[in-house]
Amino acid sequence: LLFIFNTVAFATNPPEGFTSLFNGKDLTGWWGLKTEDPSKWLSLPQEKFKAKWEASQKDIHKHWRVKNGILINDGHGLFLSTEKNYGDFELMLEYKTVAGADSGIYLRGVPQVQIWDTSKEGGKWKLGADKGSGGLWNNGPSGTRGRDPLLYADKPFGEWNHFHISMTGNLVSVRLNEKLVVHRA
């Protein structure tokens, strides 16, 4: 999983049957990636992989931090990615955006579940922020199934939002604040 938050996320006790990806203390279990297929990293010769991994650690420790159990990004640097790869999965997380946010969660590299500052003042309406967060952005042009959310489900700006994302094969469903915004796209 690849996180590109210009926002924050925090660790809590996971529901039964789920495993926490974030320990609430530090960046253990994470590395930094650009928008790229993580399998390309894994196919590198060991010495090249090690050098790239070490560089990614320097970058994420520069741009990501943990404060009071909350994972915070400064809006710069590499995207945060789990060191472990996942097949079919369900992911639950909470996030809060910052002014002007244009962020998201890459699932196995593509697609990206979009996170916006959906306020008009955020300046992203011409890009689709007026439709709300949760659509599968960077997954095709406007009109592509799942690109735009089925409905607007974001909480008012500055409040915490909750995602429940499931990916089975290449099909993604997204619930934002308990409302279905993408169904098997």
Sequence positions of predicted segments:
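Bacterial N-terminal signal peptides
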Residues: 1-6
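Carbohydrate-interacting regions of secretory-pathway proteins
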Residues: 10-185
